[in-house]
Amino acid sequence: MIAGSKLLMLGLFGALAVHALPEPAKAQVTAAPKLEERATSCTFSGSAGASSASKSKTACATIVLSAVAVPSGTTLDLTGLNDGTTVIFEGETTFGYKEWSGPLVSVSGTDITVKGASGATLNGDGSRWWDGKGSNGGKTKPKFFYAHKMFSSTISDIHIVNSPVQVFSINGATDLTLSGITVDNRDGDTDEGGHNTDAFDVGSSTGITITGATVYNQDDCLAVNSGTDITFTGGLCSGGHGLSIGSVGGRSNNDVANVIIENSQIQDSTNGVRIKTVYEATGSVKNVTYKDITLSGITKYGIVIEQDYENGSPTGTPTDGVPITDLTLDGVKGTVASSGTNVYILCAEGACSDWTWDGVSVSGGKTSSACENVPSSASC
């Protein structure tokens, strides 16, 4: 009997325990929202737009810059954006005047999309700084657009007018594509106008693609100073110094490799195809291809390759510290003014090798008698 009572009491206790204790609460787990749900689309405009955008940039999945007036001496700072951020320029973006080095705009981040809406312009109003000296003296002029440390990103349909000096600085970037970019500095085509208005300066970057660019300027359309796996295709370059490698040497990174420049036109420019390396510097230029390049209205050199640059000017004495190897020119054709030179090659002994030239035809100018150490496959 006692044993039976014990069993009955245990059974009742167990039943009470089951009913007395509540079920454990289920963990409240909220799925991470998608980026477009986590952040908002933010629009900034007017004179306070630049500051507000810079302060709020990490809270917005899409940043719309509508007719922003960037104050003088101020960078439109879009560095450190959240992954996947989209930046859209609308209307006319303007910049206040001050003598300073810039940049006027700076963007960095991963999986970033920067684009211009239809009709949008970034107006540097460079005439306020222009004095014909560029970055070599006179007024201190701000560089325009830093695309530094941009990874797996795109910049498209940006229309830049009248940059004070250099336009795009691409540095420390990987897998960056720029498409449909327009740089229009034609207002600077005067003696006291724009100078050193390079459109695209590339350094220490990998996997850079520039496609469909239209450039009117007074310096290099493209200048690759260092980097690998760089492509420039479908471009129109007018009024400047051509499509250039270099100058290579004298920087922290002095190696250029795997560059393709193709299907592009160079017109009304000082030079067409240009490669320049620095006197007594070290580095390398290898596996560079110029393919299907059309030249017209070239005033100085149709093709110029020199290993003698010092302080931005040729010395006439080439050195071998930056060899140029595996260079291909395929289908480079066009005309040079009668006062210009068709082809000029100045290599140090043994420093230019493994070149392939096919379908190269540049005429109208003079034949140089000052070429040195020209590889057998090329002609000067």
Swiss-Prot record:
Chief site of localization: secreted
Cell compartment(s), UniProt: Secreted
CC annotations in GO: extracellular region
EC supergroup of this enzyme: hydrolase
Propeptide: 21-38
Enzyme Commission (EC) number: 3.2.1.15
PbH1 repeats by residue range: 173-204, 205-226, 256-277, 285-307, 319-364
SUPFAM superfamilies registered for this protein in UniProt: Pectin lyase-like (SSF51126)
Reaction catalysis annotation: (1,4-alpha-D-galacturonosyl)n+m + H2O = (1,4-alpha-D-galacturonosyl)n + (1,4-alpha-D-galacturonosyl)m
GO biological process, one term: cell wall organization
Disulfide bonds: C42-C60, C221-C237, C347-C352, C371-C380
InterPro entries, per the entry: Glyco_hydro_28 (IPR000743), Glycosyl_hydrlase_28 (IPR050434), PbH1 (IPR006626), Pectin_lyas_fold (IPR012334), Pectin_lyase_fold/virulence (IPR011050)
Catalytic site positions: D219 (proton donor), H241
Protein's name according to its UniProt entry: Polygalacturonase 2
Keyword Electron transport (UniProt): no
GO terms of molecular function: polygalacturonase activity
Organism: Penicillium olsonii
Signal peptide: 1-20
SMART domains according to UniProt: PbH1
Glycan-linked positions: N287
Keyword terms: Cell wall biogenesis/degradation, Disulfide bond, Glycoprotein, Glycosidase, Hydrolase, Repeat, Secreted, Signal
Family, similarity comment: Belongs to the glycosyl hydrolase 28 family.
